[in-house]
Swiss-Prot record:
SMART domains: RRM. InterPro entries: NCBP2 (IPR027157), NCBP2_RRM (IPR034148), Nucleotide-bd_a/b_plait_sf (IPR012677), RBD_domain_sf (IPR035979), RRM_dom (IPR000504). One of its GO terms (molecular function) is mRNA binding. The keyword RNA-binding applies. MRNA binds at Y10, Y33, R102, V103, D104, W105, D106, R113, Q114, Y115, G116, R117, Q123, V124. It comes from the Eukaryota. This is Nuclear cap-binding protein subunit 2.
């Protein structure tokens, strides 16, 4: 059984436009959002996996907005919709760097979206995690700040 290429219920709350414009953009898009990546996954690994479904136009790695280091997501854009649909079917839910990755439609990359939206610079989901996840920087950022010794006052 094939994975769905239908739109998920997630919508980018920062989309510039109406809900119907966003829906139209998602239905016509050749761009995918890829989540749950390890902070150590490289652009080359992503290209190798996603190019099995077609010609990849561009990969934009998600970055911590302050440190400019990878923060666990990226955008993959294909030249044609049918190849993006193939990636939705065959890559979503597969394992990359020992993590199950999530692939979803994106309305199209806009400059600035490559940066994490969390208060500490990474993804919001990594701010509040209480579990230890070595592939995503250890404990959640807010918890790490609470348990890390303060070395500024020495």
């Amino acid at each position: 059984m094939f994975a769905s290429v239908e739109l998920s219920s997630y919508r980018d709350q920062h989309f510039k436009g109406s809900r119907s414009e966003q829906e139209r953009s998602l239905r016509d898009s050749c761009t995918l959002y890829v989540g749950n990546l390890s902070f150590y996954t490289t652009e080359e690994q992503i290209h190798e996996l996603f190019s099995r479904c077609g010609d990849v136009r561009v990969i934009v790695m998600g970055l911590d907005k302050y440190k400019k280091t990878p923060c666990g997501f990226c955008f993959v854009e294909y030249y044609v919709r049918s190849e993006a649909e193939a990636a939705m079917r065959f890559v979503n839910g597969t394992r990359l760097d020992d993590r199950l990755i999530r692939v979803d439609w994106d309305a199209g990359f806009v400059e600035g979206r490559q940066y994490g939206r969390g208060k500490t610079g990474g993804q919001v989901r990594d701010e509040y995690r209480t579990d230890y996840d070595a592939g995503r920087g250890g404990y959640g950022k807010l918890l790490s700040q609470k348990i890390a010794p303060n070395t500024d006052n020495r």
